Swiss-Prot record:
Organism the protein comes from: Vibrio cholerae serotype O1 (strain M66-2)
Chief localization: cytoplasm
Gene name per UniProt: rlmN
Function according to Swiss-Prot or TrEMBL: Specifically methylates position 2 of adenine 2503 in 23S rRNA and position 2 of adenine 37 in tRNAs. m2A2503 modification seems to play a crucial role in the proofreading step occurring at the peptidyl transferase center and thus would serve to optimize ribosomal fidelity.
Cofactor field: [4Fe-4S] cluster
Domain Radical SAM core: start-end pairs: 100-339
InterPro entries: Aldolase_TIM, Methyltransferase_A, RlmN_N, RNA_MTrfase_RlmN, rRNA_lsu_MTrfase_RlmN/Cfr, rSAM
UniProt-recorded name of the protein: Dual-specificity RNA methyltransferase RlmN
Keyword Thylakoid appears in the UniProt entry: no
Phylogenetic placement of the source organism: Bacteria, Pseudomonadati, Pseudomonadota, Gammaproteobacteria, Vibrionales
């Protein structure tokens, strides 16, 4: 009988120290040495860890492994964006690398599929299967860093920012999200600034409540409508936590956070003749008066079978100018990777069981109203 090996990517620093002490009978500092090899050097071979004694290396080889998702497919956009299908178990999730002049952002998935069924999102139309483990979340960053390689060797910019905006709702996977974020921030992990790690949520209020005082990262909220009636039509989660409840906890989170510099990023996808009218812009501006924020407008990225369209440039421009009359900071997101379906809302992956919507639609014992496909 073969005993399954323990994947060390499933542990943040605290968890790894505990595992080394309690399960391996080793001093905690050894855990930190191994952690540095894993994340600073991208090492997944214990024999290469030359400051670890042979006895411990043999013990690690017998009981442990360093196993990240592997790339099953890679697509390269004309603008430099890369979309990877990362194999997790017997399924794929999608991870996107977005290079810019002064940074390189990695868009990371938190679930296989998504249970929230936002009407404009391609991922949601694929159904939900399961939450990703810590190793499958942080492993996307580990694998991407290895694929990109050193800038001097590949000419590609190393990853400077991580956004939890891939497949899934991050705050419905808190158990695995928090340790993964800790590794991103840890000096022995990827050592990213808390201002360079962003979590995006569609409005899981109870998850955001948990984050207050527990983890400090940049926050982006998927609002996408200026009133409850319209938001409930395109985002069923609004029937569980309405806009007022959502914004109230958002204000408390950013007040407790240093990473957000006192402001939250409000994401607003523009759907042609659905939520992009001048009246919607006025209503949105009034709604956000009490919430320190910057507004990021996202012109809809079409996908096959979608009932929505991208607004004309004139409608997008008019919406932005209306918001700016209220002295809001408003940007329009530049579409990246749309030629490989890697743009916002286009990620699909490979969801084997498209009917499974069980645990992930339960939060604090309350059912989130989502339809079963």
């Amino acid at each position: 009988m073969t005993t399954e090996k323990v994947n060390l990517l499933d542990f943040d620093r605290k968890g790894l120290r505990t595992f080394f002490a309690e399960e391996l009978g080793e001093k905690a500092f050894r855990a930190e040495q191994v952690m540095k090899w894993i994340y600073h050097f991208g090492c997944d071979d214990f024999d290469q860890m030359n400051n670890i004694n042979k006895q411990l290396r043999e013990k690690l080889k017998a009981k442990c492994e360093i196993r990240a998702p592997y790339v099953s497919e890679a697509q390269h956009s004309a603008d430099g964006t890369i979309k990877w299908a990362m194999r997790v178990g017997d399924q794929d999730v999608e991870t996107v690398y977005i290079p810019e002049d002064d940074r390189a952002t990695l868009c990371v998935s938190s679930q296989v599929g998504c249970a929230l069924e936002c009407k404009f999102c391609s991922t949601a139309q694929q159904g939900f299967n399961r939450n990703l483990r810590v190793s499958e979340i942080i492993g996307q960053v580990w694998r991407a860093a290895r694929e990109i390689g050193l800038e001097k060797e590949t000419g590609r910019r190393p990853i400077t920012n991580v956004v939890m905006m891939g497949m899934g709702e991050p705050l419905l996977n808190m158990k695995n999200l928090i340790p993964a974020l800790e590794i991103m921030l840890d000096d022995l992990g990827f050592g990213l600034s808390k201002r360079r790690v962003t979590v995006s949520t569609s409005g899981v209020v109870s998850g955001l409540e948990q984050m207050i005082g527990q983890i400090d990262v940049a926050l982006a909220i998927s609002l996408h409508a200026p009133n409850d009636k319209l938001r409930s039509e395109i985002m069923p989660i609004n029937d569980r936590w309405n806009i007022e409840a959502f914004l109230e906890v958002v204000r408390r989170y950013i007040a407790s956070s240093n990473a957000n510099r006192g402001k939250v990023t409000v994401e607003y996808v523009l759907l042609d003749h659905v939520n992009d009218g001048t009246e919607h812009a006025h209503e949105l501006a009034e709604l956000l008066k009490g919430t320190p924020c910057k507004i990021n407008l996202i012109p809809f990225n079409p996908y096959p079978g979608s009932p929505y369209k991208k607004p004309s440039n004139s409608r997008i421009d008019r919406f932005q100018k209306t918001l700016m009359q209220y002295e809001h900071t408003v940007t329009i997101r530049k579409t990246r990777g749309d030629d490989i379906d890697a743009a916002c809302g286009q990620l699909v992956g490979d969801v084997i069981d498209r009917t499974k919507r069980t645990k992930a639609k339960q939060f604090d014992g309350q059912a989130i109203p989502v339809k079963t496909l």
